[in-house]
């Protein structure tokens, strides 16, 4: 038996499609939104639509930004010769929180996963290889320590080594299967400082 009106059920269903939002969370969010003042709901909806319309990939590193080139890539204070490769923008943000990495990033927007049908052509590897034609000294591979992250790291390493560019992998300390965005800054720093050459 459906206890909610059609509109409430639709809202719960749509919110439940978001990653990390289960049925109970979707229900809580739906009722919170329904009880918000109309102006706040309109502002929330407009903010979401604006973000969807205006956020794009940085032309250099592929992170999400509202500019053609993100602030990190356009900063003269960053070492453009050292590129850290991460799976997503959340991982980039996790390293930025440490305040210790002064290089630049490349965001893959995924990891190789044959089980899910995700191959090298489905992530931003082509863009990375184009960047490496420039003046690059080191590529630090900071993919997650999951099977997919490890497979992606090995694939990237094999692609880059023939170019004579130093390739390193962040050290463990990041638990196997752990997502970087949930790791504290100290652990991330230790992983970065203890990286190994591949």
Swiss-Prot record:
* One GO-annotated biological process of the protein: DNA repair
Keyword S-adenosyl-L-methionine assigned: no
Q: Recite the UniProt keywords alphabetically.
A: DNA damage, DNA recombination, DNA repair, Metal-binding, Zinc, Zinc-finger
Ranges annotated as C4-type zinc finger:
58-73
GO MF terms listed in the record are: DNA binding; zinc ion binding
Q: Which domain of life does the protein's organism represent?
A: Bacteria
Extract the InterPro entries matched here: DNA_Rcmb_RecR, Rcmb_RecR, Rcmb_RecR_Znf, TOPRIM_dom, TOPRIM_RecR
Task: Describe the location of the Toprim domain by residue ranges.
Answer: 81-175
Role? May play a role in DNA repair. It seems to be involved in an RecBC-independent recombinational process of DNA repair. It may act with RecF and RecO.
NCBIfam families the record matches: recR
Q: Fetch the PANTHER family from UniProt.
A: RECOMBINATION PROTEIN RECR
The similarity comment for this entry is: Belongs to the RecR family.
Q: What name does this protein carry?
A: Recombination protein RecR
Source organism per entry reads Lachnoclostridium phytofermentans (strain ATCC 700394 / DSM 18823 / ISDg) (Clostridium phytofermentans)
Q: Which gene encodes it?
A: recR
């Amino acid at each position: 038996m459906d206890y909610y009106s059609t509109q409430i059920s639709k809202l719960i269903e749509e919110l439940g499609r978001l990653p990390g939002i289960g049925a109970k969370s979707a229900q809580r969010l739906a009722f919170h939104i329904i009880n918000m003042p109309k102006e706040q709901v309109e502002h929330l909806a407009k903010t979401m639509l604006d973000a969807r319309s205006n956020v794009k990939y940085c032309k250099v590193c592929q992170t999400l930004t509202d500019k053609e080139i993100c602030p990190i890539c356009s900063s003269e204070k960053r070492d453009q010769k050292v590129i850290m490769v991460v799976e997503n923008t959340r991982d980039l943000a996790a390293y930025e929180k440490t305040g210790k990495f002064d290089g630049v990033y490349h965001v893959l927007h995924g990891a190789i996963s044959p089980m899910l049908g995700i191959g090298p052509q489905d992530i931003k590897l082509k863009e990375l290889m184009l960047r490496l034609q420039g003046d690059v000294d080191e590529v630090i591979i900071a993919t997650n320590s999951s099977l997919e992250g490890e497979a992606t790291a090995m694939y990237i390493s094999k692609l880059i080594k023939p170019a004579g560019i130093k390739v390193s992998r962040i050290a463990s300390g990041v638990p196997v299967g752990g997502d970087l965005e949930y790791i504290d800054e100290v652990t991330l720093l230790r992983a970065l400082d203890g990286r190994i050459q591949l």
